[in-house]
Amino acid sequence: MSEASSLRTKSLHTKSLLLLKPRGFCAGVVRAIDIVRIALEAFGRPIYVRKEIVHNRFVVEELQQKGAIFVDSVDEVPEGERVIYSAHGVSPEVREASKMRKLRVIDATCPLVTKVHVEAVKFAKEGYSLILIGHRDHDEVIGTLGEAPAVTQVVGSPAEVASLTLPDPSRVAYLTQTTLSLDETRDIIAALKKRFPDIKGPAAQDICYATENRQVAVKHVASDADLLLVVGSDNSSNSKRLVEVARSLGTPAHLIDDCNNIQSRWLQDVKTVALTAGASAPEHLVQEVVEYLARQGFGDVQELEIMPENVRFGLPPEIVETIAAAPAVAVQS
């Protein structure tokens, strides 16, 4: 019997809510949001942000209210102004465009995404063809692809591996987007190794710790839940993967922006709901869902800590220097 099952036996006549931990903000998201908040407090408006700082509309709307201006391209930023790169990273082309416009850049790229960029440059310099496992239209993949576009191909499924054409099958390396499904990525890597026996990979896996931890937590409780709800925006890759993981194990699952997205029919005949959140979803949205479900009779709330998570990332030098120069400016998240 799992931990969740044993807990459920304590409240046989009460509908249960299993609140998964870890959930919500990862270290890279906390860092990125802190960077925007500190920049706004230290420098005032306007502060431009290229793309959504993280993939959550509530976070973006909150920062917009504080004065952040989100743009799709650095070409939209007036010359000489400050611009923050999102947590998903940018290509060298974007960096060069910023330089040409004399923009004052603050880089909020997640350090784990930067790691993938560094690996791409390294493999390309060593003469390898690169296979980037990920979703072609995701901001992170677009940025990584830009490091070595001439030698990089993107694949999103095992089936796509068969159609790859490479100049030298013995000089191949793969990298992955950081927010993918562990299981699907494992299948793609297996297909690559079968097709290209000499293929090389990163020294350590590219899928980030938070993506992995949240997927492991979902797997841990999926069999004990009648329904899984994932708080996260539709453009959040890691949030969508959590839904897919649950469904692959036979547990109905839905992605919700907030409690207003919950449909009453989902809760019919449901005794146990599991609740988690993607890595860019604020905790207050989770608590609003908890309150909503309590009103629907899910009053037995049990928080299950599947594993500890205490990762923190340092701030970029330009932000550290700002805090040092103005002690009143502090990290808020």
Indicate where each model-derived feature is located:
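The feature marks the mature, well-folded catalytic cores of soluble enzymes
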Residues: 2-277, 283-333
